[in-house]
């Protein structure tokens, strides 16, 4: 099972992906869902107008790990491969960026007119106005894994080492922050006036929340804690796991209490 949509975050239905690839990231923009994959042969992206029926598209065969939408275009970054970033104005036809040369891309987000990509090697950050021309930025060194934007703040979290968090109001100047635990932070999102992050391992609770992107508080999720991704929509936070038994989805309205899903 590689795709499952839900109209409410509680009831899920298995759907067929466009290809049997390892789909690592999905985003939505301009009426289209777009997903990217590090595997496959010539078909490492797919798109859907409804989240149910998916169609392959054909970007370069890099190890695509993250995609986002902003400024009228989709932009993706790769962990490895000849092409490190690509962009598309329609989510179907992709153009390579020759400007970004950094390897080990992990995540990309968009906010305040800027795409921000983070890298696990050397703790690098790179920014772009259009997904094509990129500029490297100086930041605290970290094993950066995930990024989000909300309420005038970029937030980036790390999977190991210190610092485990950093923030920036403009994507250019970054400040190290303290996470709630030395956890392997996998995903962060913004919604309901707060940032919410999840992790798959760690020394403390595997969920944390921040109301300003700088100060973090622990929250307790449900059991079977191998949380890999979290997102927000329609008033609900939804986190998903890659375990094959137990709690694979958990939901929360305000992050104070989580409920088990699938």
Residue ranges and their predicted role:
Residues 1-262:
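Residue-level hotspots at or immediately adjacent to binding/recognition sites across diverse folds
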């Amino acid at each position: 099972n590689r795709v499952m949509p839900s109209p409410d975050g509680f009831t899920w239905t298995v759907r067929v992906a466009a290809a049997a690839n390892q789909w690592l990231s999905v985003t939505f923009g301009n009426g289209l869902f777009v997903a990217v994959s590090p595997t496959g042969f010539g078909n490492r992206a797919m798109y859907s107008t409804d989240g149910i029926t998916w169609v392959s598209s054909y970007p370069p065969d890099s190890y695509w790990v993250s995609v986002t939408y902003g400024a009228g275009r989709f932009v993706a970054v790769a962990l490895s491969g000849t092409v490190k970033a690509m962009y598309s104005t329609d989510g179907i036809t992709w153009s390579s960026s020759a400007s970004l040369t950094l390897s080990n891309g992990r995540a990309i987000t968009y906010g305040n007119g800027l795409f921000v990509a983070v890298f696990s090697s050397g703790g690098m950050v790179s920014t772009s106005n259009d997904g094509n021309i990129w500029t490297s930025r100086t930041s605290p060194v970290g094993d950066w894994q995930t990024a989000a934007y909300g309420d005038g703040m970029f937030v980036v979290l790390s999977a190991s080492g210190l610092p485990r968090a950093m923030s920036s109001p403009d994507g250019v100047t970054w400040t190290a922050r303290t996470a709630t635990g030395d956890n392997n932070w996998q995903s962060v999102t913004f919604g309901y006036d707060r940032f919410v992050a999840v992790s798959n391992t760690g020394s403390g609770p595997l969920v944390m929340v921040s109301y300003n992107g700088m100060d973090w508080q622990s929250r307790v999720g449900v059991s079977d804690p191998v949380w890999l991704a979290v997102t927000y929509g329609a008033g609900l936070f939804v986190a998903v796991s890659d375990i094959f038994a137990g709690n694979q989805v958990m939901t929360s309205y305000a992050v104070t209490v989580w409920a088990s899903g699938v």
